[in-house]
Regions:
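P-loop/Walker-type NTP enzyme "switch/lid" segment
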Residues: 1-17, 122-124
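Alpha-helical scaffold segments in soluble metabolic enzymes
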Residues: 10-17, 117, 143, 147
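NTP-binding/hydrolysis catalytic cores, primarily Walker-type P-loop NTPases
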Residues: 123-164
Length: 164
């Protein structure tokens, strides 16, 4: 319920030491619970693939965020990319579609390679990034982490995490 979600968000105000970052992973689509947590966050990152269903889900989420919560800044990560160039093409296509109808700012954050190493890390529940590896997966995640800070903050006027 809305009250339960509000209590969860406000419970973070009581932490003695505030975290520098907190990632909140919500399900695809514009469900009420997802929207409440997104509106309570400073920065929003949407993960897409090159598939039409992914574009539809992401567009729906961004449209609801924009129209109902006045959020207009979004970082975009392209998952399962066959190459950095293909990821950028997918982003450009999604941005073109989205900005045709919505006045939103989409920032390309980067891509997650479609690789066996990523799939194996998911199956084994082990990190794909290691300080000793200099592979395409590590490079991609390092790029993502450096660009996350560049996403513009949303000012929604709703309750926020760590809002005391």
């Amino acid at each position: 319920s809305d009250l339960e979600r509000h209590k969860i968000i406000k419970s973070f105000d009581d932490l003695k030491k505030k975290p520098e970052f907190m990632l909140i992973d919500v399900g695809a689509g514009a469900e009420s619970s997802s929207m409440t947590f997104m509106a309570s966050s400073d920065k929003i990152v949407v993960v897409i693939t090159g598939e039409p269903t992914s574009f539809i889900d992401a567009y729906s989420l961004i449209k609801t965020s924009y129209l109902d919560y006045k959020m207009n800044n979004f970082g975009i990560i392209v998952n399962m990319a066959s190459s950095p160039m293909q990821a950028k093409l997918n982003f450009d296509k999604f941005q073109s579609i989205t900005q045709k109808f919505l006045d939103v700012n989409l920032k390309y954050v980067g891509q997650i390679p479609n690789s066996q190493k990523v799939r194996n890390s998911i199956i084994s529940r082990q990190a794909v990034v290691s300080s000793t590896n200099n592979n395409i997966e590590t490079k991609a995640f390092n790029e993502l982490s450096s660009k996350l800070l560049l996403i513009e903050t949303n000012k929604t006027g709703t309750i926020k995490f760590f809002d005391n």
